[in-house]
A protein has these predicted regions:
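Low-acidity, Ser/Thr- and Arg-rich intrinsically disordered low-complexity segments
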Residues: 3-16, 21-28, 38
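N-terminal Rossmann-like NAD(P)+-binding subdomain of aldehyde/semialdehyde dehydrogenases
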Residues: 27-163
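Short, well-ordered beta-strand elements within core beta-sheets of diverse protein domains
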Residues: 64-71, 85-92, 177, 285-287, ...
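Rossmann-like NAD(P) dinucleotide-binding subdomain of oxidoreductase/dehydrogenase enzymes
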Residues: 110, 154-295, 420
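Residue-level signal for inorganic ion chemistry
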Residues: 62, 98, 120, 142, ...
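Short loop/turn microsegments at loop-to-beta-strand junctions
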Residues: 51-54, 315, 437
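ALDH superfamily catalytic-core signature
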Residues: 251, 259-400, 463, 507-512, ...
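Conserved C-terminal structural/oligomerization subdomain of aldehyde/semialdehyde dehydrogenase
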Residues: 58-67, 286, 340, 367, ...
């Protein structure tokens, strides 16, 4: 008998339910034997200050994992000042020396991969396979910038009328970052690693849903030998984030919603601080009539349901040419029905819970709105389990523009499919959005690939593949999907001051500069 795709979590072993314990910054399913359990992150003071606190909830069970103190404005500024002090020595190291720390950091991540992955899954519900892959990707990024960062930072020699002309790259200072919960380690690492190799120091305020994953990164950097103050985590809420933006940082980075990005940009503009914003996405997935439909259907499942659909670069709007729409829909539905919803700690699970009740209710509201306006539910369509914040993988057909699932960013396991008369219409409909992060186009006419990529209004276009982030390629969007780029040399250059130097005959020190830049 075939197992239902909406599998019960009630059969999970008892060590995966109820209270989870934390020791030494790592979550475990059981308390260590004969060990008294506590969750302090620092030695208790004889004169403790009272903090507001928040609770982290396991989205698979609804149980509380731990309470965390909300950092005050004074504490945030103290962290930034510590980062400023660390910057003096860190920025004066050779890039090759800074790279050594990043390579050690990658080793530490791999060493603690299993523990870090379990923490991530407990905090935000990501299935354990994807959590492990996320830690591995963080290590890859650290290796990549450790191996390539020094070359990226070498001066560019330019031929001008001067005896010697070059472009130099210098660190900006302390960089402040506000990061989300959906990729709680990767989002931080892909910002912090290029920032650090460039000679900056970093203070990160992680999402309140996943603070321990961020603290684990702080621990990993410490174990790798990074100088104290070069990378710090400050845990808290919106007031903490505001305090970080207003602190004396040189750059503010945010990964979040369009509305939040606009608020951060306004706040940062008061002091003319540079911003790097990776904002919302409603990526189109376009299927041409000559597409390999089997490959496209498998790609649609992978592109839509990674991280339970909670990804800025997940495929969120599906435009399929009429002549193949029914066949594609059938293949898409067939692949979706194989997805197993269940305990995210179970390696056989494909879809875990959404991060919160609020997120689950938002997705449910978007589906109800679509159905009320004429959409047809082909697969799923309702809550998947009474315990935790589950929602079934859902496929909608007969979707129209007036439905929220097309107008808004749908941050969950819902795939709306729109049939269109031709490829030109598909591209026009795909571009009819405030978002422009990524796009996926499926066609066997590779002669048109470059032209199609040019026509789609997005920062990233993948032909016959799903959108992903890769340390070797720039990541970012257009329109309301962001400002600036992350990853690759282009992302690293967002985090440096670019200095023009021209030396004419007779300038003091000309020979020394020539030697340095050759």
């Amino acid at each position: 008998m075939q197992t239902s795709p909406i599998a019960s979590i009630g059969s999970a072993s008892s060590d995966r339910v109820g209270v989870h314990w934390m020791t030494k910054h790592i979550w475990c399913r059981r308390p260590p034997c004969n060990e008294r359990i506590s969750v302090p992150r620092r030695k208790p003071s004889r004169h403790p200050t009272k903090h507001r606190t928040f609770s982290v909830i396991n989205p698979a069970t609804g149980d509380s994992l731990a309470m965390y103190p909300i950092a005050t404005q004074t504490e945030v500024r103290a962290k930034v000042e510590k980062a400023r002090e660390a910057f003096r020595s860190w920025s004066n190291l050779e890039a090759e020396d800074r790279a050594t720390y990043l390579l050690h950091f990658a080793e530490v991540l791999r060493k603690h991969k299993a523990d870090y992955a379990e923490t991530m899954t407990l905090e935000m519900g990501k299935i354990i396979r994807e959590s492990i892959a996320e830690v591995e990707k963080c290590a890859w990024a650290a290796d990549y910038f450790g191996q390539n960062g020094p070359a990226f930072l070498r001066p560019d020699v330019v031929a001008t009328d001067a005896m010697r002309s070059y472009v130099a790259f210098h660190p900006r200072g302390v960089l402040g970052s506000i990061m989300p919960w959906n990729f709680p380690m990767w989002q931080i690492v892909r910002f912090a690693v290029p920032a650090l190799i460039a000679g900056n120091t970093v203070v990160v305020k992680p999402a309140s849903a996943s603070p321990q994953s961020a603290l684990n990164l702080e621990m990993a950097f410490r174990e790798a030998g990074l100088p104290e103050g070069a990378f710090q985590i400050v845990v808290g809420d919106r007031t903490t984030a505001t305090a970080l933006i207003r602190a004396p940082v040189s750059v503010v980075s945010l990964t979040g919603s369009v509305a939040t990005g606009a608020q951060v940009a306004r706040e940062a503009s008061r002091d003319l601080k540079k911003v790097i914003l990776e904002l919302g996405g409603s990526d189109p997935f376009i299927v041409a009539r000559d597409a390999d439909l089997d490959a496209a259907a498998k790609g649609a499942v992978a592109g839509r349901f990674v991280n339970g659909g909670q990804s800025c670069i997940a495929a969120k709007r599906f435009f399929v040419v009429d002549s193949v729409a029914q066949e594609f829909l059938a293949k898409f539905a067939e692949n979706m029905r194989r997805l197993r919803v269940g305990d995210p700690l179970d390696p056989s699970t494909d879809i875990g819970p959404l991060v919160s009740r609020t997120q689950r209710d938002e997705i449910e509201g978007q589906v109800k709105d679509a159905v009320a306006k004429g959409a047809k539910v082909e697969v799923g369509g309702k809550r998947g389990h009474r315990a935790g914040w589950y929602f079934e993988p859902t496929l909608l057909s007969h979707v129209t523009k007036n439905m929220r699932v097309l107008r808004e960013e749908t941050f969950g396991p819902v795939a709306p499919v729109v049939a269109v008369p031709d490829l030109d219409t598909a591209i026009r409909e795909a571009n009819d959005s405030e978002f422009g992060l990524g796009a996926s186009v499926w066609t066997q006419d590779l002669g048109r690939a470059d032209e199609l990529a040019k026509q789609v209004e997005s920062g990233m276009v993948f032909i016959n593949g799903i959108v992903k982030s890769d340390p070797r390629m720039p990541f970012g969007g257009v329109k309301h999907s962001g400002v600036g780029r992350e990853l690759s040399r282009y992302g690293l250059l967002e985090m440096v001051n670019i200095k023009t130097v021209e030396i004419f005959p007779g300038s003091p020190g000309a020979s020394a500069v020539r030697k340095e830049t050759e």
